[in-house]
């Protein structure tokens, strides 16, 4: 009743208060971000910034050289030559600036999110509890690790912490953007609270778990702003490839001049620099950083924060998904629907024992048992706090049981309720022998996709015995089978993790369409499965929210922790889902794959379009010496100068044209790697060959029409 009353009041409170902030989707060219990116493009011309990108550093050096050559020859050259030299130098500068603009646009989206988050991180007064039990009001900036604070309805939680006392409805819209309030309470996996969120009802006592400057919001700001961004292994490898190609083309251009001089047609520095810049992979070199930053930003748009680009890349390479059954594959509101007694025991007796054993069970299933016993048999829920003769045994993932030890006149009566295998073992360990009838009931419920919880008791004067079974029902989510079919087409193996017995797990696994399942799983089993998969050369992704999930989250290549989870879980994972939706793991993998596909597609396009620029510049450079080279002028460009200038201008403009694709990402489809490769080679490989021929010709026509050439 208390929970129902609190949820009602929370809903009413939420109705009157709109969310203050959400990690909202922004348009691709948000005017505010564009205005911020323009000056950043100029600041990024600093050599120390350009040094991180070897390709663009070469372009920058080329722009400086051509500018100096233009200024040197300004007085001695003809007007036409000066226009040519000036335009080449200008568009080399534009090439660098466009690359800087792409990176600044990607960074700007994160900085806009960070600016909004800083509004949440405001100084508040906290009611700190002293060692003597008194309350003192202190600024939130003075709170230390393990301080204890009291937060009442209407007050802002001053810092990250764990609830150690009480239950409350909390408005987390400042973090998640979700206006509906959530329940936070002491104990279990819903005890973590975040600084900057607001208590809507009741009162809680919170133990501070974060040092100043290391709160969840501080880490969010650092992540979305890119302060913690480092190059990923794939980016480093691609940079090495691009640097190698740049060196090869640099050597080719340097050695070309002696041959040209020997042939009697030495080339000017401006022409040689133009050739070099057009041949090196400037397109992907200009967009590489933006692609990586935009990939992390797409996660932010889905309310997922990654600790690094490495985590996003790993998501794209994942080939095993570990998915918890409850809440991910099924709706997660598994409810008790029936008490099934064995012969000689009444259903009411089973309900009474099941309810007693569930009083300390804070899981949704445990609470549903208490409610069902009350509804079916009028058994009033007893408050564990006033049962002085009882010692409650809480549910844990390790024991997979909960229960109570009652001090009665005849002795100690011990009641246990939980997973069939765990309770059966408990019965055998205490002298009992589970009957075939219990096994038949368990198998019948399991084969129908339900979850059986066995109820057993043991008194001092007799052996332990099973007295009945609680039938829990859950529903597989609509459309989840189709999502798993998509994963299978991408050669991703799906494994369902559940605490259910093998029969129940098998029935649900078949209905959902997963490739495999792990039944009666403990945290140790989950960790062992991850290690086995990794030893086989597979990358593993999983979700978790509890402290017992922390080792597995840390071991997994992609560990997505729920924002509603414990502090330990959030620190162990390399991603945090602000919506606490386990199903989102599938979307995380798709975003990771989209990042890798985008990078590969634009790399293919960048290298392929060098062919057209080769056909434009090489004939133009030497057609005077070797007229036969005019046959290579397949685009029928107007003159050698217009050919070189057209290639340089196109080389700069194509970067601008591809910025939306770099930020938005290549369209993702669930298909096999070979099909994906064929499609991208056709679109971006063939496109990289054809588009430059058309683009350079169009630029040439414009140059001629303007009388520049």
UniProtKB/Swiss-Prot annotation:
Keywords, sorted A to Z: ATP-binding, Cell membrane, Ion transport, Magnesium, Membrane, Metal-binding, Nucleotide-binding, Phosphoprotein, Potassium, Potassium transport, Translocase, Transmembrane, Transmembrane helix, Transport
Binding site for ATP: 361, 365, 395-402, 417
Top-rank lineage group of the source organism: Bacteria
Keyword Coiled coil included in the entry's annotation: no
Primary subcellular site in the record, as a coarse category: membrane
Record's catalysed reaction(s): K(+)(out) + ATP + H2O = K(+)(in) + ADP + phosphate + H(+)
Disulfide bonds: none
Recorded topology in the membrane: Multi-pass membrane protein
Binding annotation for Mg(2+): 545, 549
UniProt-listed PROSITE patterns: ATPASE_E1_E2
Compartment(s) where it occurs, according to its Swiss-Prot or TrEMBL record: Cell membrane
UniProt-listed Enzyme Commission number(s): 7.2.2.6
Any one of the GO CC terms: potassium:proton antiporter complex
Gene3D superfamilies attached to this UniProt entry: Calcium-transporting ATPase, cytoplasmic domain N, Calcium-transporting ATPase, cytoplasmic transduction domain A, HAD superfamily/HAD-like
Enzyme class: translocase
Residue ranges crossing the lipid bilayer per the database entry: 55-75, 86-106, 236-256, 269-289, 615-635, 643-663, 688-708
BP GO terms, sorted: potassium ion transmembrane transport
InterPro entries in alphabetical order: ATPase_P-typ_cyto_dom_N (IPR023299), ATPase_P-typ_P_site (IPR018303), ATPase_P-typ_TM_dom_sf (IPR023298), ATPase_P-typ_transduc_dom_A_sf (IPR008250), HAD-like_sf (IPR036412), HAD_sf (IPR023214), P-type_ATPase_bsu_IA (IPR006391), P_typ_ATPase (IPR001757)
Molecular function as annotated in GO: ATP binding; ATP hydrolysis activity; magnesium ion binding; P-type potassium transmembrane transporter activity
Catalytic residues (positions): 324
Purpose: Part of the high-affinity ATP-driven potassium transport (or Kdp) system, which catalyzes the hydrolysis of ATP coupled with the electrogenic transport of potassium into the cytoplasm. This subunit is responsible for energy coupling to the transport system and for the release of the potassium ions to the cytoplasm.
Family that this chain belongs to: Belongs to the cation transport ATPase (P-type) (TC 3.A.3) family. Type IA subfamily.
Subunit structure: The system is composed of three essential subunits: KdpA, KdpB and KdpC.
Protein name listed in UniProt: Potassium-transporting ATPase ATP-binding subunit
Originating gene: kdpB
């Amino acid at each position: 009743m208390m929970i129902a009353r609190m949820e009602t009041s929370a809903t009413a409170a939420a109705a009157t208060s709109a969310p203050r902030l959400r990690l909202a989707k922004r348009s691709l060219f948000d005017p505010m971000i564009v205005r911020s990116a323009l000056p950043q493009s100029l600041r990024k011309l600093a050599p120390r910034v350009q040094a991180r990108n070897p390709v663009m550093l070469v372009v920058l050096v080329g722009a400086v050289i051509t500018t100096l050559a233009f200024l040197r020859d300004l007085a001695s050259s003809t007007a036409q030559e000066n226009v040519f030299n000036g335009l080449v130098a200008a568009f080399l500068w534009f090439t660098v600036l466009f690359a800087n603009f792409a990176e600044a646009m990607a960074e700007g989206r994160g900085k806009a999110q960070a600016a909004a988050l800083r509004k949440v991180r405001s100084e508040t007064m906290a009611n700190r509890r002293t060692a003597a039990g008194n309350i003192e009001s202190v600024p939130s900036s003075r709170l230390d690790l393990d301080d204890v604070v009291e937060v009442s309805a209407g007050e802002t939680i001053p810092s990250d912490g764990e609830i150690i006392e009480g239950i409350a409805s909390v408005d987390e819209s400042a973090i998640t953007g979700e206006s509906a309030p959530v329940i936070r309470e002491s104990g279990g996996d819903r005890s973590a609270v975040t600084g900057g969120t607001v208590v809507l009802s009741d009162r809680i006592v919170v133990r501070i778990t974060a040092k100043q400057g290391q709160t969840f919001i501080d880490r969010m700001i650092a992540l979305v702003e890119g302060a913690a961004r480092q190059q990923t292994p794939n980016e480093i490898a691609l940079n090495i490839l691009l640097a190698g190609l740049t060196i090869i083309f640099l050597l080719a251009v340097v050695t070309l001049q002696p041959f040209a001089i020997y042939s009697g047609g030495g080339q000017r520095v401006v022409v040689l620099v133009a050739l070099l810049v057009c041949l090196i992979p400037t397109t992907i070199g200009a967009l590489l950083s933006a692609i990586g930053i935009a990939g992390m930003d797409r996660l932010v748009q889905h309310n997922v924060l990654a600790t690094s680009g490495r985590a996003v890349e790993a998501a794209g390479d994942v080939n095993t998904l570990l998915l918890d059954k409850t809440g991910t594959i099924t709706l997660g509101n598994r409810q008790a629907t029936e008490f099934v007694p064995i012969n000689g025991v009444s259903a009411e007796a089973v309900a009474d024992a099941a309810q007693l054993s569930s009083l300390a069970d804070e899981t949704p299933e445990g609470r549903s048992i208490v409610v069902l016993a009350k509804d079916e048999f009028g058994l009033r829920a007893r408050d564990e706090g006033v049962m002085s003769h009882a010692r409650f045994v809480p549910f844990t993932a390790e024991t997979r049981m909960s229960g109570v030890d009652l001090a009665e006149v005849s002795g100690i009566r011990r009641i246990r309720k939980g997973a069939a295998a765990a309770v059966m073992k408990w019965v055998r360990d205490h002298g009992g022998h589970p009957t075939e009838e219990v096994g038949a009931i368990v198998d019948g419920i399991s084969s129908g996709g339900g979850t059986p919880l066995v109820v057993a008791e043991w008194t001092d004067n007799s052996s332990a015995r099973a007295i009945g079974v609680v039938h829990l029902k859950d529903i597989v989510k609509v459309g989840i089978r189709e999502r798993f079919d998509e994963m299978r087409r991408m050669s991703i193996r799906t494994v369902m993790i559940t605490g259910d017995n093998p029969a129940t797990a098998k029935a649900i696994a078949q209905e959902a369409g997963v490739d495999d399942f792990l039944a009666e799983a403990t945290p140790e089993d989950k960790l062992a499965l991850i290690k086995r998969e990794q030893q086989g050369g597979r990358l593993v992704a999983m979700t978790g929210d509890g402290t017992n999930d922390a080792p597995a989250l840390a071991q997994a290549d992609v560990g997505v922790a729920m924002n509603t989870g414990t502090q330990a879980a959030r620190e162990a994972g390399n991603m945090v889902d602000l919506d606490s939706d386990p199903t989102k793991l599938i979307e995380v993998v798709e975003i990771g794959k989209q990042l890798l596909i985008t990078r590969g597609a634009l790399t293919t396009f960048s290298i392929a379009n060098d062919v057209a620029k080769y056909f434009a510049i090489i004939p133009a450079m030497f057609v005077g010496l070797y007229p036969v080279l005019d046959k290579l002028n397949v685009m029928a460009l107007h003159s050698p100068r217009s050919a070189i200038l057209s290639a340089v201008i196109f080389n700069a403009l194509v970067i601008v044209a591809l910025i939306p694709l770099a930020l938005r990402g290549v369209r993702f489809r669930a298909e096999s790697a070979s099909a994906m490769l064929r499609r991208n080679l056709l679109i971006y490989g063939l496109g990289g060959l054809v588009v430059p021929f058309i683009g350079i010709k169009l630029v040439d026509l414009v140059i001629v029409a303007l009388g520049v050439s």
